[in-house]
Amino acid sequence: MNTAASIVCLGSWNTRIFTPSWVSEKVFSMSEGESMEIGLNEQQLNLFYKWKGIILLMLDNRLEFRSDNCSHESLSMMELFYQRLSELLPYTPVIGVGFNINLTLTHEEYAGTSICGLIERRNLDIYSNNSQTFSAEKDGAFRSFVIQMNADNVEIRANFHYSDPKKVPTVGTTFSIIEKELKHFLGYEFSLC
């Protein structure tokens, strides 16, 4: 099983604030002597910062923390960075916050879930999009689960979107809630990391 995670904050971000020194000191709280990777997002021509496996990508209307190699440490760090940013920039108009988990399961792993009959592995050579979306609103979040099957694997995307950032659970719990909901939804015991 492969896992990736992200926190997406929609709002009116002043990306000029996000200088390398400000990000390293205020957001990442890096110690002296530590360094971070600075790169260019070629699609949007914006800078991104990467430290300890966490990528901070800034666009005018969206800010994203992303980890492609999910671990309990990276999930906790992303939530902590999101909280710091909320405290550092309290007057930034934020219109929504999304917590996302993307799982990639083998067909054998997917067969062990209680929902495997919802999308069957058939006609994959004919049809390119065998997917199903499930969604509901609960505890201030719009929750959606998307299951997409292809010839190689099964992708499951979980998104918890809060249109009111004040309803986001306390730091350190949001990804735990998503993991618990995914286990319940899939009927499958696993660890995100």
Each language-model region and where it sits:
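Mixed-charge, glycine-accented linear interaction segment located at domain edges/termini
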Residues: 140-193
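Glycine-rich, often proline-containing surface loops adjacent to acidic residues and nearby aromatics
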Residues: 55-70, 92-102, 152-163
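Karyopherin-beta/Importin-beta family HEAT-repeat alpha-solenoid scaffold
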Residues: 35, 43-45, 118-124, 176-177
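Charged surface patches that recognize polyanionic ligands
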Residues: 70-129
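N-terminal low-complexity, intrinsically disordered segments
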Residues: 1-67
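Hydrophobic, Leu/Ile/Phe/Ala-enriched alpha-helical segments that form helix-helix packing faces
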Residues: 27, 31, 81-89, 182-190
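Aromatic/basic-lined ligand-recognition segments
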Residues: 17, 108-162
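Short, conserved charged micro-motifs
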Residues: 16-21, 73-77, 109-111, 166-173
